[in-house]
């Protein structure tokens, strides 16, 4: 049973299917993730499993975190995530979540931070058309009008303007696992996922699986 796993994006490649077609894929180094805490309905009000992933230096972990991780015998975990479950059967404190809990053909949702591009202009951030490049034009990459004048005398909230681009957490849903390599802790996922190589990813079983129902259908 797969509840979710943390991993690191390695990069993109291509995978050839049975028909010989090249399919773009993302390679993810996922787990093994140590189970660091079990929450039950009796003590916490809900059932959940907390896992840890990634190595770090000892001086970067404070004393409360060390005390929390000492219960599992592992003190140098960088990232902690929690997954809600219906019951705690099959989970043990100090156990591991591995890619073996997933299977080829399974649909997953992958969450991560998009690539940060810093302060960007209108064309790069929002895809605005640029102004004429001919002689006499002075608004090559300017935004143009950003609103009326005296009425309302202000810029409406949410107006698309230049600003920080990227660096936001998003979720790519319904990706298909093409291959599971338990020996090398690799997941081969069809398509692209957020972030650049080395970025932290949260892989969970897809919330929505199946074709979109037709209009008027059940």
Curated annotation (Swiss-Prot):
- A Gene Ontology term for the protein's cellular component: cytosolic large ribosomal subunit
Please give a single GO biological process term from the UniProt record.
translation
Query: Which residue ranges does the record annotate as region Disordered?
Result: 121-163
Amino-acid biosynthesis: is it a keyword of this entry? no
TM segments? Answer: none
- GO MF annotation list: rRNA binding; structural constituent of ribosome
Keywords from the UniProt entry: Ribonucleoprotein, Ribosomal protein, RNA-binding, rRNA-binding
Q: Which InterPro entries match?
A: Ribosomal_uL3, Ribosomal_uL3_bac/org-type, Ribosomal_uL3_CS, Transl_B-barrel_sf
| Keyword Transmembrane helix tagged | no
Function of the protein: One of the primary rRNA binding proteins, it binds directly near the 3'-end of the 23S rRNA, where it nucleates assembly of the 50S subunit.
For this chain, the family text in UniProt reads:
Belongs to the universal ribosomal protein uL3 family.
PANTHER family documented for this protein: 50S RIBOSOMAL PROTEIN L3, LARGE RIBOSOMAL SUBUNIT PROTEIN UL3C
The annotated subunit structure for this chain is:
Part of the 50S ribosomal subunit. Forms a cluster with proteins L14 and L19.
| Protein name (record) | Large ribosomal subunit protein uL3
Q: Which gene encodes it?
A: rplC
């Amino acid at each position: 049973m797969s509840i979710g796993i943390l991993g690191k994006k390695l990069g993109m490649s291509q995978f050839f299917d049975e028909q010989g077609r090249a399919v773009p894929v993302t390679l993810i180094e996922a787990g093994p993730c140590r189970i660091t805490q079990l929450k039950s309905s009796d003590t916490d009000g809900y059932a959940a499993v907390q896992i840890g992933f990634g190595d770090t230096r000892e001086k970067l972990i404070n004393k409360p975190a060390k005390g929390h991780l000492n219960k599992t015998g592992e003190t140098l975990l960088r990232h902690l995530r929690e997954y809600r479950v219906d019951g705690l059967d099959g989970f043990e404190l100090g156990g591991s979540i591995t890619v073996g809990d997933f299977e080829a053909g399974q649909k997953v949702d992958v969450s991560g931070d998009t690539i940060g591009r810093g302060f960007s202009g209108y064309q790069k951030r929002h895809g605005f058309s640029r102004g004429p490049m001919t002689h006499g034009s002075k608004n090559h990459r300017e935004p143009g009008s950003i609103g009326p004048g005296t009425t309302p005398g202000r810029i409406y909230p949410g107006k698309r303007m230049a600003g920080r681009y990227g660096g936001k957490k998003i979720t790519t849903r319904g990706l298909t696992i093409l291959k599971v390599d338990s020996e090398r802790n690799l997941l081969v996922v069809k398509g692209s996922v957020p972030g650049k190589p080395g970025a932290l990813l949260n892989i969970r079983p897809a919330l929505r699986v199946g074709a979109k129902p037709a209009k008027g259908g059940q």
